[in-house]
Amino acid sequence: MVIPRYHLIPTNCILSYHIKMSYLTDILKLFSLETLDTRLYPSSNTAKKQSIIKQANPKSRWSTIEFKFYYLVFLIIVPLMFKAGMESANENNPNYPKYEHLLSNGWIFGRKVDNSDQQYRFFRNNFPLLCLLIIIHVGLRRVINRIIPLSSKRTYFDFIFGIIFLIGAHGVNVLKLSIHLLINYLIGKYIKNYKLSLWITWIYGISSLFFNEWYGNYTLGLSFLSTGYTGIIPRWDVFYNFTLLRMISFNFDYLERQQKLNNMTLPKEESNGSLLNLDDRERLTAPLPIEDYNIFNYISYLTYTPLFIAGPILTFNDYIYQSNYQQSSSTKDYHRIMMYLIRFIFCLLTLEFILHFMYVVAASKTKSWEGNLPFQISMLGMFNLNIIWLKLLIPWRLFRLWSLLDGIDPPENMIRCMDNNFSALAFWRAWHRSYNRWIIRYIYLPMGGGGKYRILNSLLVFSFVAIWHDIELKLLMWGWLVVLFLIPEISVTMIFKKYRNQWWYRHLCGVGAVINIWMMMIANLVGFCLGTDGMWKLLHDLFKTFDGVRFLIISSGALFVGAQIMFEIRESEMRKGINVRC
């Protein structure tokens, strides 16, 4: 009798294989889109989900010979990138004495840490204090909810804790902030003309940014504003920009709701629609009773502590709906929250590793790249960009984690790794996603959206984005240049879209992606890392030295491979019915 060959495979080998596959599945799930935000789940609308699935290639390419070659490229190139990044700025680099003074004592293997970035240093140094505040806030909420049945009106707790937090954070400067809050509230509530009220809201909001920039230290003739306690964070105006977004959201949501009610012919008690089981999009225009748009809820929303410092940005309607009507089921799924916590810790440790082994921020601050090879200079810049991404991602995820633990689910801000981008247009959808959603709702769509005025509307959007970030001419120019860079991508996409079913289309897109990535890297390296001096040196070395030309060719090939992997990641998501358009 012939025994089938598979009977000869030991049972323990099969079991070991299944365990390994189970671990791999868990790791892939941990880093999936769905782990980040339930908003990124496949659509509950069956027709919409099937429409997305039909757009994807039904056959996966992950096991093809082509992609096995790509895996080999990854195994070679990625370690070399880390090696070059370390060599470009560590203690063995000849330029080390130029930036050694910017380094601090670290905690990993007795190494120094590059804590020279001012923004992240503030967060990193105050991280234990923030964790303590989270424990106090979440713990106090749960204790009080057990003692006093406030679960139906969470805003009571938010109002009291928010005021106390604000005084502790900004001290007497709370008075300056309060003036802005009150003026905005009066504009929204007491100017009855819908369009006029919206225009004045926008004019006052943008004017307040300029006023704070030019006269931020005003005292209103009150001596205690200059001599009194100014809190843990004396620069109250630094966080005002996020508060302004919430101020505009309240006025817009209130005026929109009032307008709808005025146009209705139903009795008042019948004019409120259903408030049951609204999804994230429906919550943006939730049919709240007009009485909910009051000064108490306004202050509770603006001072909601987990999201006050830097967001993510939640609209007024969404906040009130989740607070007083129906909490999102995601805030009760503690397994998902634990997965989110693990992913946060992974990102935190990743940044700590980079800061301990690659002193690229300090090197770029002192322009210490003399003698480095083109590959090393480019990795110095690339890891700088990764640090910028991580230093924003980590606070945003901590604040969102805090909010989830507290029972409110705001949108996830960063849904793609910075290195997982090949399109400038898609990049802006994935970067600071809650801000992008806010802009679409309150600026882009009211101005007409993506119709015949798409370019003009985009100019308006990026002008506001630039002013909101900081009032500098170079940022305004940056905003306009972004729109200029988007035009070729939009045009080429429209021209070649009809060929998407051709065998060569994916490879042509790969070439376009390489050009796009180079353009985005150059623009961001100039603006945030190397400056014009470093960029000119890199470009000179790329095109006028043998090592540079060789690196340009090899790196472009590696970027092409990376782009193909990015394409297939998105195809895999679409096969599950997920299309986040970035």
Swiss-Prot record:
Topology, Cytoplasmic side: 83-121, 180-195, 316-343, 395-454, 497-507, 570-582
Locations listed in the record: Cell membrane; Endoplasmic reticulum membrane; Mitochondrion membrane
Catalytic-site annotation from UniProt: 469
InterPro entries listed in its UniProt record: MB_O-acyltransferase, MBOAT_fam
Extracellular side: 1-61, 145-158, 217-294, 365-373, 529-548
GO CC annotation terms, alphabetical: endoplasmic reticulum membrane; mitochondrial membrane; plasma membrane
Primary location: membrane
Keyword terms, alphabetized: Cell membrane, Endoplasmic reticulum, Membrane, Mitochondrion, Transmembrane, Transmembrane helix
GO biological-process terms attached to the record: GPI anchor biosynthetic process
Superkingdom, natural source: Eukaryota
Transmembrane intervals: 62-82, 122-144, 159-179, 196-216, 295-315, 344-364, 374-394, 455-475, 476-496, 508-528, 549-569
Keyword Membrane on entry: yes
Role, per record: Membrane-bound O-acyltransferase involved in the remodeling of glycosylphosphatidylinositol (GPI) anchors. Acts only on GPI-anchored proteins, but not on free GPI lipids. Also involved in lipid metabolism, having profound effects on sphingolipid-sterol-ordered domains integrity and assembly. Involved in cell integrity and apoptosis.
Descriptive protein name: Membrane-bound O-acyltransferase GUP1
Phylogenetic placement of the source organism: Eukaryota, Fungi, Dikarya, Ascomycota, Saccharomycotina
Gene: GUP1
